[in-house]
């Protein structure tokens, strides 16, 4: 249904399409940088620890902006479109930088630019669709994450065969400028409540931490792990920079199916039961990776893990949308998503980079086991904090 009294261009499908492109840019703008890291390391001698710090800085800026976004007294269009332009420009600046401190600063600013999107875009989709349609809509939205994290590394892998990584990064920045134009045209110009008295009091309880753990577990795989995957396979098993970037791209593509399956399963079986299943699948895949070297079987388990994490992310977003009132969604979404991003996309790559640098290529795979365990802990905490929650959330019991 279109927004009451609003322009027809703000129909749910139009909002979803614009948010899809914005989320594609959110993910691909960062993926284009981390897929360039093996080439950057070969050019400058950058070690895995420095790579982890740069990518951690990228995601730290993202996490801070995700939290701040819901409190800014500016429209969704300005927050999302403006952030897209900022990140496009900082990616170009990153391509021209040479020192690690400069890269750290630029990465943080660029991450902050796209970080403004997540609470605003997710809230727009939640508000545009009825509860029985919401998880499937968010599943389509989550496709953008998989598509962006697939397309950018594949683009980098192909470009490295014919041009320097810096050229690839600058060309990809055009996607962000195009995204800003689409968002400005098709996303509702709503304003988030800001500051004291700017909306309903935030309902902060154990569910916030529980949801942050659930989201952080998924992000640790689909973002944090893939941030370091090109460096892991290049450092640990001697893959070329082009091959490492391409490997990250085509294995990440498996998340496309997981996003759709996650939306369907969350609507049919319920948010919480589907999350438990996805976390158990991630755990099984990660444990299997402990015993494998880079090759076909390794790739299969990476894809299984990616499908499960993408499905879990969709259910997590749907559960978050069901849990909180409309008046508090953008601000609470910002707090939860920022915490989840800090766990999954800052702590994870920094940790993986450190253990890769100091131990071996297999050590990051062992360390990643903490992600699904964290997700399962989040489910337990959520059920404890929501005693009335059974197999489905209150808002989706009428489904199926």
Regions found by a protein language model. Give the residues of each.
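Conserved MFS/SLC helix-loop-helix module at the cytosolic interface between two early adjacent transmembrane helices
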Residues: 64-96
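Helix-to-loop junctions at the C-terminal end of transmembrane segments
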Residues: 65-76, 259-270, 356
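C-terminal ends and interior cores of transmembrane alpha-helices
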Residues: 86-98, 281-293
């Amino acid at each position: 249904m279109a927004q009451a009294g609003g322009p027809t261009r703000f129909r749910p499908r139009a909002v979803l399409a614009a948010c899809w492109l914005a989320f594609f840019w959110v993910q691909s703008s960062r993926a284009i940088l981390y897929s360039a890291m093996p080439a950057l390391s070969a050019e400058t001698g950058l070690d895995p620890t420095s790579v982890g710090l740069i990518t951690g800085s990228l995601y730290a800026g993202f996490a801070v902006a995700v939290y701040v976004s819901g409190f800014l007294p500016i429209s969704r269009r300005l927050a999302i479109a403006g952030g897209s332009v900022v990140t496009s420009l900082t990616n170009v600046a990153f391509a021209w930088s040479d020192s690690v401190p400069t890269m750290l600063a630029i990465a943080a600013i660029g991450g902050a630019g796209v970080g403004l999107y997540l609470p605003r875009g997710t809230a727009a989709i939640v508000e545009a669709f009825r509860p029985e349609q919401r998880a499937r809509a968010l599943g389509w939205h989550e496709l953008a994450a998989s598509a962006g994290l697939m397309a950018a590394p594949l683009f980098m892998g192909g470009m490295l065969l014919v041009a320097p990584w810096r050229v690839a990064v600058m060309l990809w920045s055009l996607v962000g400028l195009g995204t800003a134009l689409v968002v400005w045209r098709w996303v509702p110009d709503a304003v988030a409540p800001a500051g004291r008295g700017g909306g309903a009091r935030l309902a902060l309880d154990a569910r916030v931490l529980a949801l942050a753990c659930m989201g952080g577990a998924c992000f640790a795989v689909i973002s944090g792990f893939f941030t370091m995957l090109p460096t892991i396979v290049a450092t640990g098993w001697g893959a070329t920079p082009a091959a490492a970037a391409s490997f990250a791209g085509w294995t990440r593509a498996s998340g496309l199916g997981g996003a759709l399956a996650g939306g369907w399963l969350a609507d049919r079986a319920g948010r919480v039961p589907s999350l438990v299943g996805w976390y158990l699948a991630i755990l099984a895949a990660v444990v299997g990776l402990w015993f494998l070297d880079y090759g076909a079987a390794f790739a299969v388990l990476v894809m299984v893990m990616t499908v499960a994490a993408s499905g879990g992310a969709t259910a997590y977003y749907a559960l978050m949308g069901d849990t909180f009132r409309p008046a508090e969604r953008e601000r609470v979404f910002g707090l939860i998503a920022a915490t989840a991003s800090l766990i999954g996309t800052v702590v994870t790559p920094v940790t993986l980079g450190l253990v890769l640098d100091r131990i071996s290529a297999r050590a990051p795979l062992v360390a990643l086991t903490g992600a699904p365990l964290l997700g399962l802990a989040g489910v337990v905490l959520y059920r404890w904090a929501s005693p009335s929650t059974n197999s489905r959330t209150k808002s989706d019991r009428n489904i199926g």
